[in-house]
Amino acid sequence: GIHVAGGRGKGYACLMPPLRPKAQAQSAQEHFEIFPYEQETNAGLALVGELKQGVYVSCPTKTSFERTPESYHLGLPCEKEPSILSSHDPRIPEHVEGYCPFRAGIQKYANPMGHLDHDLMYEVAHDMQESWHDCVQDFTFPEVDLETAINGIDMVEYMECIPKSTSEGFPHVLSRAPGEKGKMRFLEGDGEKFSLREGTSVKKAYDLLQEEIDRSVPTLVAIECPKDEKLPLRKIYTSPKTRCFSILPMEYNLLVRQKFLHFVRFMMKRRDVLPSQVGVNPYSLEWGAIARRLQEVGNSILCCDYSSFDGLMSSQVMSCIADTMNDFMGGDVSLKRQRKNLLMACCSRFSVVKGNVWRVEGGIPSGFPLTVVMNGIFNELLVRYCFKKIMREGGATPLECSAFDSYIRFVVYGDDNLISVSPVIHDKFNGKLLKECMARFGVTITDGKDKTLPTLEFRPLEDCDFLKRGFIQRSELVWDAPEERSSLYTQLHYVSTKMQSLEDAYTGNLVNVIRELYMHSPKEASDLRRKALRDLPWLSRSKIGTMENVQAFYAMQRAGYRMDESIDVICDLAKLGKYVKGEACKEIVWLTPTVGACDLRYFDWQNAKVDEFWVLCQTNYHEFDENRVMQLCWTPGSGRGGLPTAHWLRTCMLLEKGNVRKKLHWAMAEKKKIIFCAKGGVLIPTVMAGIFLSKEDPMLNLAGVSTLTCAMESVKTLGFLKEGNLNLF
């Protein structure tokens, strides 16, 4: 039993009912060594155990950013550096010797917010729900199937596929083989559509979790990982403050997407009327729409910043938000119960931090699929709650207390917000009162523009920032959203060289800096471009575009032109054409009597004949006869055609002693017909087949070159490969 009450020297106990073990949590907890008692206990955090001997979770300890040569900096200052990812980082100052980014990062969950008045909280949540109903139009909120949760919906805005390169979560990371990472080993498919692979640990955990959420709140295990990002120098050399992000199990993320994908789309689509600005395009006329909305009630803005926002949300508030979302989305009793149990799970969980296991009570994990949307809803609820509480305590009339939408204009993105307050109520609702009200339940709010200020004062919109961008009015319609210069200039000092050379990464950053600087001053942007061309001999005019290209970019954005995100329209204007020409090819294209290419939409590789050898390009199958089938997978290079990088071609396709060439050479020797194939067209397999032919045999070289010549007519026009790659052929 358990003690439940007491008084006047007497205690009262209650028998505990039999508790059903949570199976999906046990599969993870079998890797834990739980301490006899909790250590380092706080309101929202406690050290409860450690990973068993031999169990290790890898997290990056070296930055992916590479410092550029001095000449690349173009005389501009650097106010940011890569964050501290290891306790052995030599940049850690002496006065914080022993600083550990893992341990410091988890502390944001130590002190969640206090208790809110239940009735008032649900009252303002109902107000928010009413605002959703007012703009719901023809949106519906059905649960999507697992295939849609994985693949998204083609050509439907804000219904993208699940990120496949990110971590699979705990405990699945423990089964990685050397070189494996991400979610792909738990998926299988033809390169366009994927499904969850049967028999894997993720599929088993998914089935278990699906059953569990219909009965109770599941127990989650997250991995806390330091974030590799560029931070202000004070957060490195003065007071180190590395942020951590949470990696949640893949099966949990899939189920959350199934239940809430349509709700997220609704919030993003209706940002024109709702406070949440997730999905906003700062280059378009949307920024002006935000400015005009805020100034509808005046130009007195509270620019707010929360302290440790990620760790604030309590289970009380999460329960309220879950109820509100359920009431709004509808559905049967079972679906509502599943939704709420999923949301409540992320508020009470275990977190693996290096080798330690912590119990976390509160906050929203940053790796949660709904993180930014839920944070925005939480942010709005706090502001609305304080508004009503302050107004009532200040003696306002019931009519004034219910007039949030009349006196306030409000935009929010996660923990970022701007609150425009009508001068009519400045004496009843202002920064001082808001700061004091939030402090009562453990929430610290400061000035978002200058975090060192002890007070929170009204600012004109032109002196505010939102998403680290300012507001500059160019006309009645157009407002620019200049990004802070410190973030821009740092891009010339540090670049991410994943899958590209230092020069290519730098060029991309330089183009972005010029484009962003244009919003500060077209002259500054033009001067920087000229200086770069003058100081960097290897940089050509064609690589960074012209100032006219930059002007055209903004004109297109403001005209509502839907950009192709896979190309850079400033530098790659030739790529604005169609992806492919002509009709789909429904036959095998034979380059030679024994080497062909085809589209997997019209052919089934699983019915391969004995004398055929199929080369599957960019598929993800795990079971096939290696004497009949080979699979080629690569991370696509820059451009939009999906072709591999030059480095991959050299090390895999062109390396004579490599496994790929050996296997293809064997197939040729066995007199098999080799068929290169991919889903969605014949261009990629034709190029790959042509490369193979041009390198495999001098007698076949002519066929390979002829094939590549034809293919390159499309490839070059569409920008599928960079110019430097053509010398490979």
From Swiss-Prot:
Residues 299-429 form the RdRp catalytic domain. Residues 1-21 form the Peptidase C3 domain. Its EC number is 3.4.22.-, 2.7.7.48. It catalyses: RNA(n) + a ribonucleoside 5'-triphosphate = RNA(n+1) + diphosphate. The record marks 26-27 as: Cleavage. One of its GO terms (molecular function) is RNA-directed RNA polymerase activity. GO terms for cellular component: host cell endoplasmic reticulum. Keywords: Covalent protein-RNA linkage, Host endoplasmic reticulum, Hydrolase, Nucleotide-binding, Nucleotidyltransferase, Protease, RNA-directed RNA polymerase, Thiol protease, Transferase, Viral RNA replication. GO terms for biological process: DNA-templated transcription; proteolysis; viral RNA genome replication. InterPro entries: DNA/RNA_pol_sf (IPR043502), PCV_3C_PRO (IPR044067), Rev_trsase/Diguanyl_cyclase (IPR043128), RNA-dir_pol_C (IPR001205), RNA-dir_pol_PSvirus (IPR007094). This is RNA1 polyprotein. It comes from Andean potato mottle virus. The lineage of its organism: Viruses, Riboviria, Orthornavirae, Pisuviricota, Pisoniviricetes.
